[in-house]
Amino acid sequence: TLATLTAWHMLVERARVKAGEDVLVLAAGSGVGSSAVQIAKLSGARVIATAGSEEKVKLALDLGADHAINYLERDFLQEVRRITGKRGVDVVVEHVGTDTWEKSVGCLARGGRLVICGTTSGAEGKTNLWQLFAKQLNLIGSYGGTRRELQTVLKLVADGRLRPVVDRSMPLEQAAEAQWLLQERRHFGKLILNP
């Protein structure tokens, strides 16, 4: 539920997503991404998700995404522009970093909000400053969540309105295999190691 808490804090508290907005969730197969898809949908947003395989695209759609893009086969910036009629999205949930940063900023509509909580692929990102001020964009950092938010998330999970996604549970002795699955991006949601 920590990934779900992180996604909740990003979308609800920091980006303040509203019903009717367009939200782009990067890496929907991650713990934060799979939770963000559900939270954005629960908030009444139209959700566009990215994922790295056709299987993950299907799983993102099953979680509630309205559109899902296989970023290994299609340019997600071009696809977002096509889906939104060149307008862009109101909110980008960014936690990948260097590999996606420039395109993530490019996906934003005028006045859009990019909320970031991680840098899986690196912490350096090129930003077109003209685009930042001309489109009046908002770049928002997000870290963790509050006890009150955790209580809200746990209630939504208990009520079945949010579902933390667990790909598989493995014995601790298989930690090396679990690490390999993470590095090769062969999971959807969280991997759990049991002692």
Annotate each predicted stretch with a short phrase.
Residues 24, 92-93:
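N-terminal Rossmann-like NAD(P) cofactor-binding module of classical short-chain dehydrogenase/reductase
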Residues 76-86:
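Short amphipathic alpha-helix with an adjacent loop that forms part of the alpha/beta core around
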Residues 43, 51-54, 60, 95-165, ...:
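Glycine-rich phosphate-binding loop and adjacent beta-alpha segment
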Residues 86, 161-165, 177-195:
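C-terminal capping/lid region of NAD(P)-dependent oxidoreductase domains
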Residues 1-74:
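Mid-domain Rossmann-like dinucleotide-binding core that forms the NAD(H)/NADP(H) cofactor-binding site
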Residues 19-21, 89, 111:
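Phosphate-coordination loops involved in phosphoryl transfer and adenosine-cofactor binding
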Residues 7, 175-178:
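Non-catalytic, hydrophobic alpha-helical segments
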